[in-house]
Amino acid sequence: MRAFLYATIVFGLVGFLLGLTAALMLFNPELPEFFFGTDDATIKSLQSGNLQGLINTQGAFGFGRIRMLHTSAVIFAFVANGFFAGAYYSMQRLLKTRMWSDTLSWIHFWGWQLMIVSVVITFLMGINTSKEYAEHEWPIDILITVVWVIFGVNMIGTIAVRRVRHLYVAIWFYLGTWVAVAMLHIFNNLEVPLSFGGWKSYSAYAGVKDALVQWCTGTTRLRLF
């Protein structure tokens, strides 16, 4: 689908720009205050909707949140959309058939972009799990799971109606990636919501176990993509 390719280009530029911004802020933490002024009552400014409070280091556009946006934009918006674009393009040619369901393809596309927008909004609001590369809270984790399953169903359906007898190695890699990423995502994001009416949750793991599961997921998912 070309839509995934266009999304890859757009989010690639956004991700790189966010990375540059985070790097500049890391080099000079007071850079936002240099442009927008300082405010000792940052939290109070945030509550009153003051732009200055939003911009400086503890606000919505401070370093901590910009960095989370950068990593998530690169992984889930840029790299993932690129993977989907490549998978859709190559599967139809290697299997000599169209995707099994155009409807599922579009649900997959818009569902994934909805997830990205949700991540941006929640991160800017300070809603996150603090688990690096997996900071999104449990409702977004569920959305990712649903969309990932839709992608898998469409892929397996396309394989089932293929017009060639054999399967190229690339197709096996796609299947393996789909299964492995699903397992990594589910086990890494096992969380206990504080309440089903809110966003806050706590990891099902603690201490070293949590760190091992987190970074097994963080590094492996990137390699699979």
Language-model segments: residues:
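Hydrophobic cores of alpha-helical transmembrane segments in multi-pass integral membrane proteins
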Residues: R2-E30, A41-T97, D102-G126, P139-I159, ...
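Transmembrane helix-loop junctions at the membrane interface of multipass transporters and ion channels
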Residues: G126-E132
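Inter-helical turn/loop segments and adjacent helix faces that build the functional surface
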Residues: T158-H166
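Short, flexible helix-coil linker/hinge segments at the edges of structured domains or between repeats
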Residues: F196-D210
